[in-house]
Regions:
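Domain-level signature for soluble enzymes in the chorismate/prephenate branch of the shikimate pathway
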Residues: 1-7, 11-15, 24-334
């Protein structure tokens, strides 16, 4: 983010002052009258500054152990000073947020190679949370072993099944190395370093090697260099909203259901097409308790409170069986 230091400092002071005054709504009204804070990059910086200025009690839960990709995403979304708490499963992360044990949860929602994380979609629907941010991280895997272990001696490589699947070409080139699935990439590194076996390694990121003192035997072993994971920042639904950015810098995620009749999905999407609203992603998941009926998750560009998105959502609510806005949040710009 390339902004002048004085502009960023002005932005920080303005947003921190608003936080101290607990004046979120007033903040939204005042932003357009501050010309120096009108650019999207400054607005996004303001959102980050608000996070930085929150009391030190804020916590974030993520799935995995120290050195996991989700921990890196949490640092991106919050700050290096954030109090981060690892959880064993995605279910644990959502439960921690919903029950007030953590102010935020950081969860992966999709990967450019593996596709959508379906369980995360289900948990978004099942828990009373909302999305308030997103980030995208490039995923680069390495083969990591205890010190003094040679690549030629490795016979087992531990990692999350998705990570192993993204490194198939490496395992074809090294047929003596068996891929062993475990629950977490960084956790695999922690395990092999603790055990100290001369024939075991793990597939994870460079940062995991740094955290646990591992040695990198092979770098960039993923099949494709363009490997990215998108992460969401979730918080309890009743939490105050963060600072607003311009509508075009927002993404909105909704979930809706329709009747099983011809043209129902088409009619549901028509209000967005007629208003030229960009639909970034659509995902379907089974509606539990209703065999062969589905929930549709939709990512669209724009803010739910701003026209024309608000008009389209109103029209959708008339046609659909149910509609729920899961969150409007500053979208990742890369």
């Amino acid at each position: 983010m390339h902004v002048r230091a004085e502009s960023l400092e002005q932005c920080r002071e303005f947003f921190c002052e608003a936080m101290l005054q607990d004046a979120d709504r007033d903040l939204v009204q005042r932003l357009p009258h501050r010309p120096s804070l009108s650019k999207p990059s400054i607005r996004h910086a303001g959102w980050r500054c608000m996070i930085d200025c929150m009391p030190s009690a804020y916590d974030a839960a993520y799935q995995g152990t120290r050195g996991a990709n989700s921990e890196d995403a949490a640092i991106d979304l919050l700050s290096n000073e954030a109090k981060l708490f690892p959880r064993d499963t995605l279910e644990d992360v959502f439960a921690a947020v919903a029950q007030g044990e953590a102010r935020y949860g950081v969860v992966p929602i999709e990967n450019t190679l593996a596709g959508s994380i379906h369980r995360c979609y289900d948990l978004l629907f099942e828990h009373d949370v909302k999305i308030v941010g997103e980030t995208v991280r490039r995923i680069v895997f390495a083969l990591i072993a205890p010190p003094d272990v040679a690549l030629s001696a490795v016979r087992k490589a531990l990692s999350h099944p998705v990570a192993l699947a993204q490194c198939e070409q490496f395992f074809r080139k090294h047929p003596l190395i068996q891929a062993v699935p475990v629950y977490d990439t960084a956790g695999a590194v922690e395990h092999v370093i603790r055990e100290g076996r001369g024939d075991s390694a793990a597939v994870a990121t460079r940062r995991a090697a740094e955290v646990y003192g591992g040695v990198i035997l092979a770098e960039s072993i993923q099949d494709h260099s363009e490997n990215y994971t998108r992460f969401l920042l979730v918080t309890p639904s009743k939490s105050p909203e963060a600072a607003k950015a311009p509508a075009e810098d927002y993404k909105t995620t909704i979930v809706f259901s329709v009747g099983n009749v011809p043209g129902a999905l088409y009619q549901s999407l028509r209000p967005f097409a007629e208003r030229r609203i960009d639909l970034a992603k659509i995902e379907s998941r089974p509606l539990r308790g209703s065999p062969f009926e589905y929930l549709f998750y939709l990512d669209l560009i724009g803010c739910a409170d701003a026209k024309p998105v608000s008009d389209a959502l109103h029209e959708l609510s008339v046609q659909a069986k149910s509609v729920r806005v899961l969150g409007s949040y500053p979208r990742h710009r890369g």
